[in-house]
Amino acid sequence: MATYQVRLISKKENIDTTIEIDEETTILDGAEENGIELPFSCHSGSCSSCVGKVVEGEVDQSDQIFLDDEQVGKGFALLCVTYPRSNCTIKTHQEPYLA
C-alpha cells in the first residue's frame, strides 16, 4: 500500500504540518489520526464543511457528490472523501472561499 506525504496549511488557523497518509485513508481521517482538528460535518461528501483546496499533487475524490465541476477544477476537495494519490499540499478551512 502506498503512503504519501500530505502537507496541510492554513495561515488563519496556524497550521503548517506534513503527515503521512496511506492511499486508503481519507485526508480528514489522516489528519484526525495525527491530532489535527479540521472542520467537518457529514463525513460522506455531501456538504462543504471540510472543503480544502489542493495546491499541489494528486488526489481522488470520486466519492464526493457536492462540488460542481468548476469547483473541482479550481482545486477544491471535500477532505472527508478525498484520498491522496501523490505527495500533496492542501489548504484547509476553505469553506468561506468556495463560492
Swiss-Prot record:
<dbReference type="GO" id="GO:0009055">
    <property type="term" value="F:electron transfer activity"/>
</dbReference>
<protein>
    <recommendedName>
        <fullName>Ferredoxin, heterocyst</fullName>
    </recommendedName>
</protein>
<dbReference type="GO" id="GO:0051537">
    <property type="term" value="F:2 iron, 2 sulfur cluster binding"/>
</dbReference>
<keyword id="KW-0408">Iron</keyword>
<keyword id="KW-0411">Iron-sulfur</keyword>
<dbReference type="GO" id="GO:0022900">
    <property type="term" value="P:electron transport chain"/>
</dbReference>
<keyword id="KW-0535">Nitrogen fixation</keyword>
<keyword id="KW-0001">2Fe-2S</keyword>
<feature type="binding site">
    <location>
        <position position="80"/>
    </location>
    <ligand>
        <name>[2Fe-2S] cluster</name>
    </ligand>
</feature>
<dbReference type="Pfam" id="PF00111">
    <property type="entry name" value="Fer2"/>
</dbReference>
<feature type="binding site">
    <location>
        <position position="42"/>
    </location>
    <ligand>
        <name>[2Fe-2S] cluster</name>
    </ligand>
</feature>
<dbReference type="InterPro" id="IPR006058">
    <property type="entry name" value="2Fe2S_fd_BS"/>
</dbReference>
<dbReference type="GO" id="GO:0009399">
    <property type="term" value="P:nitrogen fixation"/>
</dbReference>
<dbReference type="InterPro" id="IPR012675">
    <property type="entry name" value="Beta-grasp_dom_sf"/>
</dbReference>
<feature type="binding site">
    <location>
        <position position="47"/>
    </location>
    <ligand>
        <name>[2Fe-2S] cluster</name>
    </ligand>
</feature>
<dbReference type="InterPro" id="IPR036010">
    <property type="entry name" value="2Fe-2S_ferredoxin-like_sf"/>
</dbReference>
<feature type="domain" description="2Fe-2S ferredoxin-type">
    <location>
        <begin position="4"/>
        <end position="96"/>
    </location>
</feature>
<keyword id="KW-0364">Heterocyst</keyword>
<keyword id="KW-0249">Electron transport</keyword>
<keyword id="KW-0479">Metal-binding</keyword>
<dbReference type="GO" id="GO:0046872">
    <property type="term" value="F:metal ion binding"/>
</dbReference>
<keyword id="KW-0813">Transport</keyword>
<comment type="similarity">
    <text>Belongs to the 2Fe2S plant-type ferredoxin family.</text>
</comment>
<dbReference type="InterPro" id="IPR010241">
    <property type="entry name" value="Fd_pln"/>
</dbReference>
<feature type="binding site">
    <location>
        <position position="50"/>
    </location>
    <ligand>
        <name>[2Fe-2S] cluster</name>
    </ligand>
</feature>
<dbReference type="GO" id="GO:0043158">
    <property type="term" value="P:heterocyst development"/>
</dbReference>
<dbReference type="InterPro" id="IPR001041">
    <property type="entry name" value="2Fe-2S_ferredoxin-type"/>
</dbReference>
<comment type="function">
    <text>Ferredoxins are iron-sulfur proteins that transfer electrons in a wide variety of metabolic reactions. Donates electrons to the nitrogenase 1.</text>
</comment>
